[in-house]
């Protein structure tokens, strides 16, 4: 492969040879002169024909029957001799010839001007992409992204038409995921979250810190969009919250029961997503799996609070509790779990193994494992949380498969955010795992069995800690009808939770950004805009400054620079706020879509849009909808 071919792509093509502007000018003028001569020749032949090829016109170059071919400029000589004749035929012929010459010369002048302009543009084009071809998307390029369509997708910003000064909302309706960089108090709620929730007609799971999204969007989603509006607020004491029991999602008495419980207990003993790093975590997880199976099979309180109550029962010590598991008949249906020798075993083998494991440990180790396990379940000792996780008023399966779409708001007061995080993490984990377990295929293509798409609107996403299932499955959950909209403050926040080798960012097809506060994010966004080629003009003067002999020479030099430098990214015009900190005017933003030119956009303000404003005024339900009681 030669060097030119190695540099040729749809984005940039290296010129084969540098062209001299002077040579291009001479070529253009030569063509223009040739055209003038052809025009004069046409005038000569026209006048000769009008005058009947009279012998007085002189001898022609060539005679072809009745046609005579004269020299190109002969008509000018004829005009000098006979223009004063009072013959209308003669004067008319010369008059028309002059008009023909004038019109033709004008056309040639236009051709010359166009050619010179085109040559200059080609010369500039050869150099303007030399160091990089980055630029902001034009109207056609914005349209090419598909974001200006009239679908029902999520809002990612707006684009202002420079010519018509008209704002165009940008919506992404594809299955791909969206990530937004938006610092606190930057207007992400009024510009991204609320417009999306006030228009998205399908199911949604919304991580709603402060409950603002429930208050402003659940009314419209329930009343106008035909959704079930469910609010799960674990710390609610007024009865307005739906209840959710994570253990109700376990498929008891199936081959999946152990895997379901293991997934739940792994999330419980790993509240920050750092993995099972020590002996106590691993032992606690194994113990809780066994105890959970016993509770689901044999205890009355089949909840997480029921597990901690069983482990901390003041009427018996740990050894008696473990022996109780071994002595319990879990096989009430008579299906049996045979022992290796074929004899019947009526105690669940996984529960029995966990209990026997604990009895075989030394007293100090056993005490440490029990203490660790109970510590992980302390949250569920709170009577409010215990009450709100006692039964399930909805099931994970309902989110995408109920007759109507379901909007689930995970409402967490800021004061309880850290305390309730393990429960919210557990629920999101169950959503992702439960709705991406099975895919059907027909005629060589995947077929989704769900009735509704599901939007995962997760504001302050990194605050949930590392969700391994999310990072692992983000690449394929779109195929199951799940679309993630992840909002983070800056890239370092994501790196803190997932490490610099994370794959969350790369699996988001659309990235939008408000003015960042951290230089790491600004540098990343600057690199994402790309490198542009800048043409620098310089002038030099010689001779007397005011004299007629002064000479001016101009030179151009191409250099590179980022389309936006890091400091320019940090200085993106932010939203204008009043004295109370409320947003009054939209700021600027950046919109990136894989495979497309970056868009310099404008923020949306939902309260300045009559449609959004009217929808936000629909009152939220006083109580959450209930789909089931299990």
Q: How would you name each of these model-derived features?
A:
Residues 1-186, 190-193, 246-247, 531, ...:
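Basic- and hydrophobic-enriched, low-structure N-terminal and domain-boundary segments
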Residues 33, 66-70, 220, 291, ...:
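Short amphipathic alpha-helical patches
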Residues 14-15, 70-76, 401-402, 505, ...:
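Short alpha-helix boundary/capping motifs
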Residues 39-40, 44-52, 117-122, 161, ...:
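P-loop NTPase motor domains
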Residues 474-476, 480-590:
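Conserved ATP-driven motor cores of ASCE-family P-loop NTPases powering translocation/secretion/packaging/pilus
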Residues 5, 152-154, 550, 567, ...:
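Residue-level marker of intrinsically disordered, low-complexity segments enriched
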Residues 71-74, 87, 257, 317, ...:
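Short, solvent-exposed helix-helix connector turns and helix-capping sites enriched
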Residues 138, 303, 565:
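Residue-level signal for threonine
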């Amino acid at each position: 492969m030669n060097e030119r071919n190695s540099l040729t792509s749809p984005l940039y093509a290296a010129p084969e040879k540098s062209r001299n502007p002077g040579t291009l000018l001479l070529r253009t003028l030569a063509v223009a002169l040739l055209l003038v001569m052809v025009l004069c020749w046409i005038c000569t032949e026209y006048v000769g024909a009008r005058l009947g090829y009279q012998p007085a016109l002189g001898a022609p170059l060539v005679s072809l029957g009745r046609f005579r071919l004269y020299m190109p400029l002969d008509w000018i000589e004829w005009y000098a001799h006979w223009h004063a004749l009072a013959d209308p035929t003669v004067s008319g012929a010369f008059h028309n010839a002059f008009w023909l010459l004038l019109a033709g010369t004008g056309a040639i002048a236009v051709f010359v001007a166009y050619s010179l302009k085109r040559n200059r543009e080609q010369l500039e084009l050869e150099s303007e992409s030399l160091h990089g071809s980055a630029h902001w998307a034009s109207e056609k390029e914005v349209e090419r992204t598909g974001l200006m369509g009239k679908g029902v997708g999520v809002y990612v910003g707006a684009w202002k038409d420079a010519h018509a000064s008209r704002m165009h909302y940008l919506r992404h309706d594809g299955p791909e995921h969206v990530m937004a960089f938006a610092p606190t108090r930057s207007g992400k709620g009024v510009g991204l979250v609320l417009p999306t929730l006030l228009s998205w007609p399908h199911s949604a799971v919304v991580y709603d810190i402060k409950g603002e999204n429930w208050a402003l969007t659940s009314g419209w989603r329930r009343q106008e969009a035909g959704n079930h509006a469910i609010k799960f607020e674990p710390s609610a004491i007024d009865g307005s919250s739906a209840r959710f029991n994570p253990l109700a999602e376990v498929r008891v008495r199936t081959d999946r029961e152990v895997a379901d419980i293991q997934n739940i207990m792994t999330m419980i003993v790993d509240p920050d997503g750092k993995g099972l790093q020590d002996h106590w975590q691993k032992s606690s997880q194994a113990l809780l799996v066994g105890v959970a199976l016993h509770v689901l099979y044999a205890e009355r309180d089949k909840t997480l609070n029921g597990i901690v109550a069983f482990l901390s029962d003041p009427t018996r010590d740990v050894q008696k509790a473990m022996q109780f598991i071994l002595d319990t008949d879990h096989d009430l249906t008579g299906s049996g779990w045979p022992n290796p020798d074929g004899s019947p075993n009526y105690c669940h083998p996984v529960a029995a193994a966990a209990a026997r494991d604990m009895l075989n440990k030394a007293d100090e180790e056993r005490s440490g494992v029990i203490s660790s396990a109970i510590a992980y379940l302390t949250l569920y000792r709170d009577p409010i949380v215990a009450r709100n996780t006692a039964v399930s008023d909805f099931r994970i399966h309902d989110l995408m498969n109920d007759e109507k779409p379901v909007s689930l708001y995970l409402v967490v007061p800021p004061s309880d955010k850290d305390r309730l995080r393990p429960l919210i993490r557990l629920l999101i984990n169950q959503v992702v795992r439960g709705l991406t377990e099975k895919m059907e295929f027909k005629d060589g293509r995947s077929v989704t069995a769900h009735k509704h798409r599901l939007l995962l609107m997760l504001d302050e996403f990194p605050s949930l800690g590392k969700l391994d299932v999310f990072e692992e499955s983000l690449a394929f959950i779109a195929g199951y009808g799940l679309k993630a909209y992840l909002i983070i403050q800056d890239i370092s926040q994501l790196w803190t939770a997932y490490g610099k080798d994370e794959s969350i960012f790369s699996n988001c097809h659309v990235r939008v950004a408000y003015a960042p506060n951290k230089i790491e994010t600004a540098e990343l966004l600057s690199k994402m805009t790309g490198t542009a080629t800048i043409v620098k003009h310089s002038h030099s003067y010689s001779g007397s400054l005011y004299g007629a002999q002064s000479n001016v020479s101009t030179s151009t030099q191409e250099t590179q620079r980022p389309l936006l430098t890091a400091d320019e990214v940090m200085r993106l015009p932010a939203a204008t706020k009043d004295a109370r900190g409320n947003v009054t005017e939209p700021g600027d933003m950046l919109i990136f879509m894989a495979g497309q030119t970056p868009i310099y956009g404008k923020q949306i303000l939902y309260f300045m849009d009559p449609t959004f404003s009217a929808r936000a005024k629909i009152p939220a339900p006083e109580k959450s909808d209930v789909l089931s009681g299990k």
